[in-house]
Each structure stands twice: as C-alpha cells, then as structure tokens.
C-alpha cells in the first residue's frame, strides 16, 4: 500500500486535501485523525507537520509527501521533487525596518531571525555576508521589535503581515516556492505512484482548462481553429445544415473571454464554455 504524507495544518493542508479529494482519494473529516486508509485506492495517508514531511520521505519511512519547496530544501532531506502542484506559491525574502536596509550586503555583522536556517545560511555564504542567524519556529516578524534580531528572512505570499509589523522587503528573492509532491530520490518508483501522479496531473489540467464549443461556417474554420488549436487539434463535427460545423476544443481558463471574443470576430456563434471535472492527458 502506498504511504503518503499530507500536511496536517495551515494553507498547505487545506489545498492538499482539496486536491487529493478532487483526484478521487478519501481524506480525513476531522483534524484529530492522524492516519486514514483508503483501501479502494490502495493508499495510506499520514497527516504530519509540513516541516517534518521531507524528513519522513527522505528517510524512506514514507513513499511520498506533499510539502513546500522551501521546507524541502531547508530540511536537507534526501527527497526529490516529483510534481509541482501549482498552489502555495511564495517567495523567501529578506525584510527589515523601513528604510534601514537595501541589500543583503547591508546585513554584514547583523542578526537575522528566520525559521529557515539552512536556506538563509546558504544564501549568506553565497553572498559573502557574515551575519548571525537566529533560528525561531515562527512569528519571526516580531523578533525585531523584541530586540532579538535586526532583520528577518521569511516566506512571503502577499507581504501583508510584514507591512502590518512595520517591515519592508528588500533585495531580490532568495528563492521561490510552491507545493510539491516529493519522493525519495534514489529509490525505485513505488507501486501506485504512477496512478497518483496521473490523477494529480489530471486535476491540474481540469483547473487550468475549460472546454469550449462553438458553431461556424466551414470556410471560416481555418481562422477559428488557429484561435483554438486545442491540445492535439480540435474536434470538428458536421451540423445538420450545409456548410456548418461544430467545434470543440480545450482552452486555457485564464484566456476564456479573450478567446470567445476572438472567435466571435471571425464568425463563430453559439459559443459555450463548460468546466472540466477531471482529465487524463
């Protein structure tokens, strides 16, 4: 049975559980459940601290896990990225009091608080900056006011929390992060991984694309199919009246209205859009 680690709290947890549910896997109904066995799909899910997941997977205790790239790299675990999951996007940034710092070089001899000690120390070494790293488990934005640090390094999504604490981001992002499916890099592919990966890829496609249908005259078809080429070409079916066809094609969800406008301009009519519930590409 495939053994998979899932974050047990926070935004990573909610989005991971939603994605696994959309992929057809049973998920826990209560935060008190630590383990859930999905016998129908041959998967055992373990709900763990996001920061610990890479360690369990890298150590071979569990086959797979869902965690952030930031947590994976900071852990130093022997686990590798298997699939990007397109949620929990963030950046690892430096921040400090307004107007005090402009680059990482300004941190020479300073104290920097972070929950990501490995990532920060690696970055400082690469930049040739000698600074004291103060490791905290959370709420690092309060460390400057409390006199523990001069600056911080933290994962940022919107930056609202930092601004509320009177801090500003400076210098370039240290790294970008998002949610990942990970596995131990030097192990053979575990049984069941290919199905899980294919299902998650199907969820990503279903979230990113819609199905677009429209009617058009045959002589106008080349211009229309140039707008909607689909993945491997559109599906074209004759209609009941001479010279008209129905076209079906996958379109990126973000481009829906722009594509509909372009189709209308070249003569397409009865343009309809339907969501994709699941996909295998």
UniProtKB/Swiss-Prot annotation:
PROSITE patterns: ATP_P_PHORIBOSYLTR
Keywords from the UniProt entry: Amino-acid biosynthesis, ATP-binding, Cytoplasm, Glycosyltransferase, Histidine biosynthesis, Magnesium, Metal-binding, Nucleotide-binding, Transferase
GO biological process: L-histidine biosynthetic process
Listed CDD domains: PBP2_HisGL1 (cd13591)
Regulation: Feedback inhibited by histidine.
InterPro entries: ATP-PRT_HisG_long (IPR020621), ATP_PRibTrfase_cat (IPR013820), ATP_PRibTrfase_CS (IPR018198), ATP_PRibTrfase_HisG (IPR001348), HisG_C (IPR013115), N-reg_PII-like_a/b (IPR011322), N-reg_PII/ATP_PRibTrfase_C (IPR015867)
Recorded metabolic or biological pathway in which this protein acts: Amino-acid biosynthesis; L-histidine biosynthesis; L-histidine from 5-phospho-alpha-D-ribose 1-diphosphate: step 1/9
One of the record's GO cellular component terms: cytoplasm
EC number in record: 2.4.2.17
GO molecular function: ATP binding; ATP phosphoribosyltransferase activity; magnesium ion binding
Annotated compartments: Cytoplasm
Cofactor: Mg(2+)
Reactions catalysed according to its record: 1-(5-phospho-beta-D-ribosyl)-ATP + diphosphate = 5-phospho-alpha-D-ribose 1-diphosphate + ATP
Top class in the EC scheme: transferase
Stored NCBIfam families: hisG, HisG_C-term
Record family assignment: Belongs to the ATP phosphoribosyltransferase family. Long subfamily.
Purpose of the protein: Catalyzes the condensation of ATP and 5-phosphoribose 1-diphosphate to form N'-(5'-phosphoribosyl)-ATP (PR-ATP). Has a crucial role in the pathway because the rate of histidine biosynthesis seems to be controlled primarily by regulation of HisG enzymatic activity.
Name listed for the protein in its UniProt record: ATP phosphoribosyltransferase
Protein species of origin: Kocuria rhizophila (strain ATCC 9341 / DSM 348 / NBRC 103217 / DC2201)
């Amino acid at each position: 049975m495939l053994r998979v680690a899932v974050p047990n709290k926070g935004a990573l947890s909610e989005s991971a559980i939603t994605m696994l549910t959309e992929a057809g896997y049973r998920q826990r109904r209560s935060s008190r459940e630590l383990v859930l066995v999905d016998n129908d799909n041959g998967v055992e899910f373990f709900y763990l601290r996001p920061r610990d997941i890479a360690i369990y997977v890298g150590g071979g205790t569990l086959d797979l896990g869902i965690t952030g790239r930031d947590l994976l790299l900071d852990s130093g675990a022997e686990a590798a990225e298997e699939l990007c999951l397109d949620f929990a996007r963030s950046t690892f940034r430096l921040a400090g009091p307004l107007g005090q710092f402009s680059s990482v070089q300004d941190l020479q001899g300073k104290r920097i608080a972070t929950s990501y000690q490995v990532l920060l120390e690696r970055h400082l070494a690469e930049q040739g900056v000698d600074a004291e790293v103060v490791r905290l488990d959370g709420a690092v934005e309060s460390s400057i006011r409390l006199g523990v640090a001069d600056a911080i390094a933290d994962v940022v999504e919107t930056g609202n929390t930092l601004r509320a604490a009177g801090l500003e981001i400076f210098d370039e992002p240290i790294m970008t992060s998002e949610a990942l499916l990970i596995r131990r890099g030097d192990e053979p592919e575990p049984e069941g991984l290919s199905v899980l990966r294919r299902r998650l890829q199907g969820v990503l496609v279903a979230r990113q694309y819609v199905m677009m249908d429209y009617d058009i005259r045959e002589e106008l078809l080349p211009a229309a199919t140039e707008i909607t080429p689909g993945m491997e070409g559109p599906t074209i079916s004759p209609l009941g009246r001479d010279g008209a066809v129905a076209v079906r094609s996958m379109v990126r969800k973000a481009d829906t209205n722009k594509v509909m406008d372009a189709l209308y301009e070249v003569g397409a009519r009865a343009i309809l859009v339907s969501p994709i519930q699941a996909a295998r590409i």
